[in-house]
Amino acid sequence: SSLVPESNRELPQSITTIFPGNCDGELYMTKGHQHPDPQGEIYYGLEGQGGIILFDGKKTSWLDITPGKIGYIPPGWAHRSINTGQTPYKFLAVYPGCAGHDYQWVLDNGMGLRAFKSNNNFELIEF
């Protein structure tokens, strides 16, 4: 977690690790959140294989993230990270400090997609 304050004009950052595995077939993931002050966010893949489910309340999108790849999350889109590989998935996130984090939005609205183990790969299923 960043020592940079989550305030206007600052750029906090964090490194997240998601271990491989699943619960009843659904791949391990973060809780997901939306930013109350809609701001863009950058994810940079460090290790492993994973991706980001994006949801704006109507449309869904998927971004593959691998080492060295940058993923952009547009303002107003909720996002959740998922480990789609067999090794730990690690990424760096950088976001404006004024953005905030609203986890309740995801509990109330879902994410539009879920990721499930499928043989040696994964499958995205709408819900």
What does each model-found stretch correspond to?
Residues 1-65, 84-89, 94-127:
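Active-site region of the double-stranded beta-helix
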